[in-house]
């Protein structure tokens, strides 16, 4: 039988991946009932996602919500400062979603 897990975390990970839908599909396939997935993104104000000068990807809130909407229920999301680059804080968002 295939192993199922209760908790997944990807904090400061998705910034290294542009198209993240496949990540969410894999996580969903490994979820036990009501499993939680906690992840962060760097905020992108445009559509979908973009590769930044920092060589990291930023994702829009709408892009993420469209991907998770049929696989997970969003329990919480908060705007945060995810890291500091030099003297500048980088805007991000942390999500807590639950498998449906």
Could you say what each language-model-derived stretch is?
Residues 81-100:
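Core SAM-dependent methyltransferase catalytic element
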Residues 56-77:
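Short alpha-helix
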Residues 9:
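A conserved beta-strand element that flanks and buttresses the S-adenosyl-L-methionine
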Residues 39-41:
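Acidic carboxylate diad motif detector
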Residues 21-36:
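A short glycine-rich, Lys/Arg-flanked "PGG" loop and its adjoining helix->strand segment in the class I
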Residues 47-63, 85:
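Acceptor-substrate binding/catalytic loop of class I
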Residues 13:
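Hydrophobic adenine-recognition pocket in adenosine-nucleotide-binding enzymes
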């Amino acid at each position: 039988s295939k192993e199922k897990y209760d908790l997944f975390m990807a904090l400061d990970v998705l910034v290294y991946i542009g198209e993240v839908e496949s990540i969410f599909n894999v996580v969903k396939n490994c979820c036990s009932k009501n499993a939680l997935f906690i992840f962060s993104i760097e905020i992108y104000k445009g559509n979908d996602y973009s590769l930044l000068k920092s060589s990291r990807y930023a994702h829009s809130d709408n892009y993420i919500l469209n991907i998770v909407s049929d696989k997970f229920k969003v329990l919480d999301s908060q705007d945060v400062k995810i890291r500091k680059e030099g003297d500048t804080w980088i805007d991000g968002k942390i999500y807590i979603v639950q498998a449906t």
